[in-house]
Amino acid sequence: MFADISAQHWAFAIYVIGAIAICLTMIGLAALLGGRAQGRTKNKPFESGVDSVGTARLRFSAKFYLVAMFFVIFDVEALYLFAWSVSVRESGWVGFIEATIFIGLLLIGLVYLWRIGALEWSPRKPQLNNKNTD
């Protein structure tokens, strides 16, 4: 049964057994040698020597998520352009025209986002009408 197993399989099996043994040894030594503090503050969160104050839940503005989504969208599109730039000689003029149309669509999308105010970090200030209506 063990004669038909190749040397590579034996080496992998020894590696897996060794990795599991090292993990179990470290967990066992930590359990044996680790300190056992009992008291009120055992279950209290500890962060870099500073006692925690307040809640851990923070509210983030939706602008953070919008910026992250825009980054992902334009980053993926940059990857498409990188793939095109690698094969620019093989794609010829047809590929160049397609890439130009693609870049144009990206610019149209960017202008649209800019026009609707999605890229502005602070809210728009209301415009005051200074017309005298006497």
Swiss-Prot record:
Subcellular localization, as worded in the UniProt entry: Cell inner membrane
EC code(s) of this entry: 7.1.1.-
Catalytic reactions on record: a quinone + NADH + 5 H(+)(in) = a quinol + NAD(+) + 4 H(+)(out)
Main location per the UniProt record: membrane
Protein's UniProt keywords contain Transmembrane: yes
Name listed for the protein in its UniProt record: NADH-quinone oxidoreductase subunit A
Family indicated by similarity: Belongs to the complex I subunit 3 family.
Taxonomic lineage of the native organism: Bacteria, Pseudomonadati, Pseudomonadota, Gammaproteobacteria, Alteromonadales
Gene that produces this protein: nuoA
Membrane-traversing stretches: 12-32, 64-84, 93-113
Protein source organism: Shewanella oneidensis (strain ATCC 700550 / JCM 31522 / CIP 106686 / LMG 19005 / NCIMB 14063 / MR-1)
